[in-house]
Amino acid sequence: MAKEIKFSEEARRAMLRGVDKLADAVKVTLGPKGRNVVLEKKFGSPLITNDGVTIAKEIELEDPFENMGAKLVAEVASKTNDIAGDGTTTATVLAQAMIREGLKNVAAGANPMGIRRGIEKAVAVAVEELKAISKPIKGKESIAQVAAISAADEEVGQLIAEAMERVGNDGVITLEESKGFTTELDVVEGMQFDRGYVSPYMITDTEKMEAVLENPYILITDKKVSNIQELLPVLEQVVQQGRPLLIIAEDVEGEALATLVVNKLRGTFNAVAVKAPGFGDRRKAMLEDIAILTGGEVISEELGRELKSTTVASLGRASKVVVTKETTTIVEGAGDSERIKARINQIRAQLEETTSEFDREKLQERLAKLAGGVAVIKVGAATETELKERKLRIEDALNSTRAAVEEGIVAGGGTALMNVYSKVAAIEAEGDEATGVKIVLRAIEEPVRQIAQNAGLEGSIIVERLKNEKAGIGFNAATGEWVDMIEEGIVDPTKVTRSALQNAASVAAMVLTTEAVVADKPEENKGGANPGMPDMGGMM
């Protein structure tokens, strides 16, 4: 396919048009008085959102050169979302400001490489200063504030704070769509995995359709159990102890299953069998997790262990096990706390090394099950459109809160960036490098300016006053008052602000140093009909 090439100023101008189109659509959502954007969907109702990255991903421009510019800024939003989970609109606003200011200077004859060095120097200083003014997040109230600011909803803030308090910082918090109108929190204590009983005859509570085992022994094996003779020695020992038994195996079938069910129905012996969670290597790892949590051992032929020679000493224990049709929950496993801690650290080390998003998610789940528990926020709304929008906002708030726990918080509403202004302005640089520093200075004013404009105020007046205010004092666009931002609970996670600035600078530097842009040449339409076709006027 033929290509079209644009060079230097013409190329950069075309990309800037794309940058502006995307950024202008995204930045209207910034701040407490930001507006929504409606996205057309091929199927179903349109999506209403104020999430920067969701809007950015939807935008495709007709002109291929403009589209490249738009896609680069969409990359800023996407990268910030991947690292920090929020702050995508701020990142887009910063990138647009840096690109626009930078291109003005390049057009006036400045050297792009010099500007790039200046931008990198300024951003490094700004990031260091942000880390220096960052405050660690303490207590439920602070967590609730961060979440409430991100979701623009205090009720959501309280829910997320409660979820984090209940499952701990390593716990998993997931979002589900609720059947009702209200948004609620459901917390699963202990370790839960998605496998239920193999036979409904094993249930102990017919009303709830679940099997509840108090103080049971837990047999953990990766084998398929079908021969009852293999199980008999350990079953006899458990019966003598007068306690119930949970069997976690690849499968329990045939004679073994029939014997367990018959004994349960006769009231001789209470046992519940469930299939092992996961598949392949992940199954082995999860069985090992369960064994460590309950103080048992995995009975595996790979390790030279046989079922028929198993004793009670190899079984795990827990204070309670609840098995439903689809899930098994082990509460208060009797494992050694030091071994559990070592296992958690091992999973953390694997988390740091993995590059696969899927593996990361599964490791995070395993970590949560060992360390804390699982909280489910069930999102409710009156209509499907509202539900989608609300779910997106809560997802952002959740990510924002995790980022705050990780790296602390700074004053929100763009104030933190303005607080590092003087440090960046004090950088000693000359020539084009100094121009790069000035570009960053102009860009870090932009979030405050945009928040004020979205609230219907003159941005420049707010920016100038903020430069003269003492650190931490900022403009609350929701009320129109000047307040101590952190005291008022208007905060941003340091990680979000830092990532937005770094990613914006990275893409801006790429655009400024672009000298040629290559795109596919649009094919000219040579007419739809075949020129050799006869006239069809006489056809009915």
From Swiss-Prot:
- What Enzyme Commission number(s) does the record list for this chain? 5.6.1.7
Would you kindly state one Gene Ontology biological process term found in this protein's UniProt entry? protein refolding
User: How is this protein organized at the quaternary level?
Assistant: Forms a cylinder of 14 subunits composed of two heptameric rings stacked back-to-back. Interacts with the co-chaperonin GroES.
Cell compartment(s), UniProt:
Cytoplasm
Q: Which UniProt keywords apply?
A: ATP-binding, Chaperone, Cytoplasm, Isomerase, Nucleotide-binding
Q: In the UniProt record, which is one GO cellular component term?
A: cytoplasm
Matching Pfam families: Cpn60_TCP1
What protein does this entry describe?
Answer: Chaperonin GroEL
PANTHER family per record? 60 KDA HEAT SHOCK PROTEIN, MITOCHONDRIAL
Instruction: Tell me a Gene Ontology molecular-function term this record carries.
Output: ATP-dependent protein folding chaperone
Positions with a binding annotation for ATP = 29-32, 86-90, 413, 476-478, 492
Matching NCBIfam families:
GroEL (TIGR02348), PRK00013.1 (NF000592), PRK12849.1 (NF009487), PRK12850.1 (NF009488), PRK12851.1 (NF009489)
* Predominant localisation class: cytoplasm
The text of the family note is: Belongs to the chaperonin (HSP60) family.
Its UniProt entry gives the catalysed reaction(s) as:
ATP + H2O + a folded polypeptide = ADP + phosphate + an unfolded polypeptide
Work out whether the entry's keyword set contains Isomerase.
yes
Q: Which SUPFAM superfamilies does the UniProt entry name for this protein?
A: GroEL apical domain-like (SSF52029), GroEL equatorial domain-like (SSF48592), GroEL-intermediate domain like (SSF54849)
Q: What function does this protein fulfil?
A: Together with its co-chaperonin GroES, plays an essential role in assisting protein folding. The GroEL-GroES system forms a nano-cage that allows encapsulation of the non-native substrate proteins and provides a physical environment optimized to promote and accelerate protein folding.
Q: Which organism is it from?
A: Geobacillus thermodenitrificans (strain NG80-2)
